[in-house]
Amino acid sequence: MIAILWDASHIWGYLLLHAVRSTGIPYRVLKGLDIAQTGLSGKMLMVPGGSARRKAEALGPAGAEEVRRFVRQGGRYVGFCGGAGLALADGLGLCPWKRDGMTDRLQHLVSGSLCCDLAEGSELIPPHLAGKTALLPVWWPGRFSEPDEPDGVEVLARYRAPGPDLYVADMPFSSMPADILAEWKSMYGVTLRPSLLDERPCAVSGSCGRGGWLLSYSHLETPSGNFPGSEQAGAWLLHVLRLWCGLPSDMTELPPLEFDRLPVLWEDRVLLDARASLLELLALAEHLGLLFPRNSWLLGWRSGVPGAQFNSLNAAISTTLSLRPDDRRLSLWTPRRKEFESAFALFFQGARSWLLARRLADTLADSAPGMLPRELLEDQRRALFGSPMFGGGLSEQLLNILEELV
């Protein structure tokens, strides 16, 4: 049995859910309050990406202590990105390392695949990848602060070189020649080369009592993509699940994922209408050049556009429609169905207006700066989408209703 801590996960929770469901391993989706009140059992706790701070707040002191007890008594903890950050010294304290700060915001805006050197001699690394280079995906990662002494921490992977689909903010890294990057640094003081590439640690592991943990700023749960090597992260995750959860050995890679093509098992009019309206918004944003395709499950976005929230809503609505409407889900959905319908109608109208206004502001930026005040756009954005890092807004209200149904 795998427990998945859901709080503050959004699209990263749905990505992990897709990976775990594909294996057939029994799982439970839990909130921090559930863990604090009823404890943990089973073999593994998996924590998806998202805000580590908000996950810690959801667990509270009692939930955090229960996670530590679970691992000390033989459980396994696997955390990706924000789930990795949660387990560091200033969080759960499973790993003695700390999170490294970033003074340059651009260094956080890195997404796509990186070539990573994998260690030799660790049972947690698949034999066919041990000591080799693998393509591992990162999606706006934090990073470990590596001390001079490892303090019982084993580095499993280090970043080495950019992969074929790497972006910095909304710019494909492959489109930026080295001489231009050097020129920008000299002329503007802007450094777009990710400092992660300076052989920083990507994934680490260690023990705690009778249990163990694996923390990765690479999202190993990322589905296979459309280029060679994109299956390697999933192969690593499946190896860990075989080792720690007894997954049968015949599964070698995670299946692809297209949220829009998930089967519809819950034919609810309100949910279906919401999906149709959201797809209309996404099409409008693409037409305006504010969103663009990244891969089969993710849309990229221009800087300043709330792409994370659009992606999370798409994942949430599509996944909810793919679930069976059992008694538990219906008992949660029925009392909030009308609330969701009304809130989504407000969101649709507001988001459509904001997307068009944002595009107009871009058009007027040179010829008539200030005609459409950026402060007003920011206020509207916060009301609809909240903070890019910490959520909120009308979109989070919708996500909270949908995430109860998982």
Regions found by a protein language model. Name each.
Residues 1-10, 264:
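Short hydrophobic beta-strand segments
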Residues 5-6, 15-16, 109, 114-115:
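A binding-site-centric feature that preferentially detects glycan-recognition modules on secreted/surface proteins
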Residues 9-91:
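Helical hinge/lid and interdomain linker segments adjacent to catalytic or ligand-binding clefts
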Residues 9-10, 51-53, 83-86, 99, ...:
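Short, solvent-exposed loop/turn segments at secondary-structure junctions
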Residues 28, 78, 156, 214-216:
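Hydrophobic/aromatic beta-strand patches that form the interior of the parallel beta-sheet core
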Residues 53, 57-140:
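A glycine-rich, often tryptophan-bearing local segment used as a flexible ligand/cofactor-contacting loop or short
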Residues 114-209, 217-221, 300:
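Catalytic beta-strand/loop cores that center a nucleophilic Ser/Cys/Thr
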Residues 198-200, 209-406:
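Extracellular ligand-binding/catalytic regions of CAZymes and related secreted enzymes
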